[in-house]
Regions:
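Conserved pre-motif I regulatory segment
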Residues: 14-53
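Pre-Walker A (Motif I) flank of P-loop NTPase domains
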Residues: 44-50, 71-72, 120-122
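Walker A/P-loop
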Residues: 45-64, 76
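Conserved phosphate-coupling serine/threonine residues in phosphotransfer and NTP-handling enzymes
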Residues: 54-56, 127, 186-188
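Conserved nucleic-acid-binding Ia/Ib motif block in the N-terminal RecA-like helicase ATPase lobe
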Residues: 74, 80-126
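Conserved helix/coil segment N-terminal to the catalytic DExD/H
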Residues: 105-147, 157-161
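Post-DEXD/H (motif II) to motif III coupling segment of the RecA-like Helicase ATP-binding lobe
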Residues: 142, 146-150, 154-198
């Protein structure tokens, strides 16, 4: 089956944009295996499951499209230390990002929200527990969220070794933000866990 010239040009241009973005912000010349396939799926608007080994570069699969898309990328992650590390790392690359978790004081949350609204952030990291707040979820409606990432997605599944009931709050987000694709990322998942995630 031949690919028409318009499609070929599109794929070539998109591939160049992805590689240039990777180089500009992270200094890498090449993607690792599976990264580009996952990124292209997300940019085509598809809900996507990314099964990649620990250390395989899962963060790049949402950070690169997050820089290309107009608007905000919402990242749901269970570990506060991990979200802090990722936000700090993005800031070192001159990328604006904030985080919210259930343990923040009112003042900390207000300061983070002000940064989110006033500084054109590209990434918003939240703990799944934060999504239990109806007020917080309603505030998400006012944001231009273009991609939703579920890190450690195996925590969704009751079959998983690390099931977290708070991950069930993620269902609300689909109703609140129906048009943004979901990217679920995990290093390991049995067939039962994959079925639950999908």
């Amino acid at each position: 089956k031949s690919i028409n010239s318009t499609s070929l040009i599109y794929f070539t241009i998109m591939s160049d944009i992805l590689t240039l973005t990777l180089k500009k912000y992270w200094g890498f010349d090449f993607f690792r295996p599976l990264q580009k396939d996952i990124i292209k799926s997300v940019l085509d608007g598809h809900d996507t499951l990314g099964l990649m080994p620990t250390g395989g570069g899962k963060s790049i699969t949402f950070q690169v499209p997050g820089m290309i898309l107009e608007g905000l990328t919402l990242v749901i992650t269970p570990l506060i230390s991990l979200m802090k590390d990722q936000v700090d790392n993005l800031k070192r690359h001159n990328i604006r990002a904030v985080y919210f978790h259930a343990g923040m004081t009112h003042r900390e949350a207000t300061t983070a929200w002000d940064k989110l609204i006033n500084s054109k952030c590209k990434f918003l990291y939240v703990s799944p527990e934060r999504l239990s707040s109806e007020r917080f979820c309603n505030e998400l409606k006012s944001l231009n969220i273009r991609l939703i990432v579920i890190d450690e997605a195996h925590c969704i599944s009751q079959w998983g070794y690390d099931f977290r009931p708070s991950y069930l709050n993620i269902k609300k987000i689909r109703k609140i933000i129906p048009n943004a694709p979901f990217l679920a990322l995990t290093a390991t998942a049995t067939p039962e866990v994959v079925t639950d995630i999908c």
